[in-house]
């Protein structure tokens, strides 16, 4: 099975798998059952921003999700990713719909990782920024229903004539692997930011968007749609 660390923007509470009974952001370590959550209210049709950061000295993974002029939701969890992730990973965005649906539109995405070892000269970093997405992106691995549209947006789940479709799952991963930790590293850190737009014709949108880090050969697990956000094969 894949090794996944994720930050979920969960628009549909699935209390049977441990979700709180409200929309929330959560930190997921190798399971859809979040280690930490905080209440979050999706604003239909508005552009929001998610920022995720990790620092190996503090060993803390944090996320903040906000809308312009609105309050922000923050969640953090203390974890040593060296013990969980392989040294080389890929980073991605994932989303799904179930019976209920929503658009899972990404307008921009940036990521920076830094790895400092004892030798001052030997610092590795990776940085990318997408302010828009090209029609046939060479630097993204698109999985499932993910596609880029003529407006320069990344649609993680299927949209037909502007309407979100049920039972869709899709992911986009950056093509280059990231050296996320090293046993000789003094500091390993990363920051990710993406802007998103969730819009739903349903009173209950579903299911959500996640930023995730996985083994480099990660693919969408069978049966991982809906509440599993395209990340996990089951709800354990």
UniProtKB/Swiss-Prot annotation:
Ca(2+) binds at residues 10, 12, 14, 19. Concanavalin A-like lectins of the Diocleinae subtribe undergo proteolytic processing referred to as circular permutation. The propeptide is split into an N-terminal and a C-terminal part, the gamma and beta chain, respectively. These are then religated in beta-gamma order to form the mature alpha chain. The beta and gamma chains can often be detected in cell extracts. Residues 1-118 of the mature chain, as displayed here, probably constitute the beta chain in the propeptide, residues 119-236 the gamma chain. The lineage of its organism: Eukaryota, Viridiplantae, Streptophyta, Embryophyta, Tracheophyta. Keywords: Calcium, Lectin, Manganese, Mannose-binding, Metal-binding. D-mannose/D-glucose-binding lectin that also binds derivative alpha-methyl-D-mannppyranoside. Has hemagglutinating activity towards rabbit erythrocytes. Binds one manganese (or another transition metal) ion and one calcium ion. The metal ions are essential for the saccharide-binding and cell-agglutinating activities. This is Lectin CPL. A carbohydrate binds at residues 14, 99-100, 207, 227. Pfam families: Lectin_legB (PF00139). Belongs to the leguminous lectin family. Mn(2+) binds at residues 8, 10, 19, 24. GO terms for molecular function: calcium ion binding; D-glucose binding; D-mannose binding; manganese ion binding. It comes from the Eukaryota. The keyword Protease does not apply. Homotetramer; dimer of dimers.
